[in-house]
Amino acid sequence: MHIFSAIPLALRRSAAWLCVVFASAGGLHAQTAPAAPASSASPGAPTAQKPYKLRIVGGLAGISQYTRQEEPFWNKELARLSGGRFEAEIVPFDRAGVPGSEMLRLLQLGVVPFGTTLMSSFTAQYPEYTAPDLAGLNPDIATLKTTLAAFRPYLEKALRDQHGVEALAIYVYPAQVVFCKKPLRTLAELSGRRIRVSSSTQADFVGALGGVPVLTGFAQIVPSLTAGNTECAITGTMSGNTLGLPSITSHVHALPITWGLAVFGANQTAWTALPPDLRALLRRELPRLEAAIWEESERETADGMACNRGAASCAAGTKGRMTLVPVSPQDERSRQDILSSTVLPRWVQRCGNRCVDIWNQTIGPVRGLVATSAVSK
């Protein structure tokens, strides 16, 4: 009782809601059902035992990462791969009453033994972890892969040592691009426009272009555009299509402003308590799930763009008639200049001078970009 009382009220509410969500399956934590009592079995008959079952909090509901990859893996593939010895039940975090900003803390406490947390949710408390997806840093997915590869050893060690969380996989969402209601030829023409953003780093990028960043929730993108509160919106290529943006915006710029990374992690105590053969299976199979999600994200980024402009190759979305604005040499120069002069320095300001060393020892060398200490005021 003392331990639970020490947990902040918001986290206790999340824990209570998760218990309700998983109640029909017997609770949140991994468990095995006990063997049938010997008295109920015939002499010499094998003892029946129920599968060992995991409770997983997954990523965002309703998107391909979850519906085509995470959910099938945990609900079906785990049992198939283990010959029925292990099973799992998964619920998306945004339908489980779990605040995205609290997921890391819930993992650390063990309230959520196994869960997916958006790295953008670290901005307020742990801005150092957001480094690999700064706005303008990764103009394509190949660059993002090398950026993350340079940062990953630091991230995994920090999560393990500072939070007691074992990072088992890192997922990616499709590219976040700019949709606009009025004609657009270059990024420079975003100056003066009110633009929906979803993170501090996107706001830094938009502000450096002379635009007006408007922090807006995903569900409010369409109402905000329709009401005229915003003129443009940064969102995923396919999620924008799903929202119906081709019917209310006319131009979409090809440059990925950000992507969106998520960590699938385990509370260390819960992880080490798993049967060794289950840990081995997950160590083998989760990298394959990660690779499949990255491939899915790359396909969906391209398909979203194809659908928005009404290309014949559109497969999963609704064909629109949008104008695709290519990345011009001027746009590429702007991206590089804004990244080095605004986005990176603002991240250092939020993160503190300790993050200068983190950057310069991880991402900086592979991107050819040196961070410097914030100037004291």
Please provide the spans of the model-predicted regions.
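N-terminal secretory/targeting leader peptides
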Residues: 31-142, 160-162, 166-377
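A gly/proline- and charged-residue-enriched helix-loop-helix capping module
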Residues: 139-156
